[in-house]
Amino acid sequence: MSSQYSNVENLSPQTIRQVMRELQEMETTPPEGIKVLINESDVTDIQALIDGPAGTPYAAGIFRVKLTLNKDFPLTPPKAYFLTKIFHPNVAANGEICVNTLKKDWKPDLGIKHILLTIKCLLIVPNPESALNEEAGKMLLERYDDYSQRARMMTEIHAQPAKCGVGAVGDAKDDGGPSTKKHAGLDKKLQDKKKEKLLKEKKRMLKRL
């Protein structure tokens, strides 16, 4: 995130300390399926990786999300976005997330961990009644199988570890050596073939709609 959009200088030192303390606690003891990515130079730019929950169309995907703290935080809620493309009723085309916790149900004592857990829960139980993506909301209510297939397809295309530049949330980082690059090349070929196949399936599915 560019420093020109940073609100660090607008936050109180107490708020900055509280946010950093919570992020460091989450880094040491991460919630299940969530990994925070700390930007020590700008605590208003918070990113995390969320594992797609098992039993949902998002399973096996890894989703990068972003929280942006404004100058009135924690009196006002942060903005939340999916940086990974996702087909979900409560996620707009620009990635903005609609959830009551970040709107009418916001309380200043709700922390970053609570927000990230709420976003993960949204992957398990979408709320089509307050949809930002009306197509996804309508499809979920009226043709769930089609919704599930579309969401799963988007997950397979956009939410794989290679797309996020990371391994699974629990994986160790590689050292970027020759062996890693060799495997990356093979993985890319396999992913390209898989993507081509998925796009063909998507076209067939869209023709049936």
Swiss-Prot record:
Active-site residues annotated for this sequence: 98
Known EC number: 2.3.2.23
A GO BP annotation: ubiquitin-dependent protein catabolic process
Domain of life: Eukaryota
Reaction(s) catalysed (UniProt annotation): S-ubiquitinyl-[E1 ubiquitin-activating enzyme]-L-cysteine + [E2 ubiquitin-conjugating enzyme]-L-cysteine = [E1 ubiquitin-activating enzyme]-L-cysteine + S-ubiquitinyl-[E2 ubiquitin-conjugating enzyme]-L-cysteine
Residue ranges, annotated region (Disordered): 168-194
Span of domain UBC core: 14-160
Comp. bias intervals (Basic and acidic residues): 184-194
Entry GO terms, CC: nucleus
GO molecular function: ATP binding; ubiquitin conjugating enzyme activity; ubiquitin-protein transferase activity
InterPro entries: Ub_conjugating_enzyme, UBQ-conjugat_E2_core, UBQ-conjugating_AS, UBQ-conjugating_enzyme/RWD
Keywords (A to Z) from UniProt: ATP-binding, Cell cycle, Cell division, Nucleotide-binding, Transferase, Ubl conjugation pathway
SMART domains: UBCc
Leader peptide range in chain numbering: none
Pathway as given in its UniProt record: Protein modification; protein ubiquitination
A Pfam family matched in the record: UQ_con
PANTHER family given in the database record: UBIQUITIN-CONJUGATING ENZYME E2
Job description of the protein: Catalyzes the covalent attachment of ubiquitin to other proteins. Acts as an essential factor of the anaphase promoting complex/cyclosome (APC/C), a cell cycle-regulated ubiquitin ligase that controls progression through mitosis. Acts by specifically elongating polyubiquitin chains initiated by the E2 enzyme vih/UbcH10 on APC/C substrates, enhancing the degradation of APC/C substrates by the proteasome and promoting mitotic exit.
Stated family: Belongs to the ubiquitin-conjugating enzyme family.
Protein name, per record: Ubiquitin-conjugating enzyme E2 S
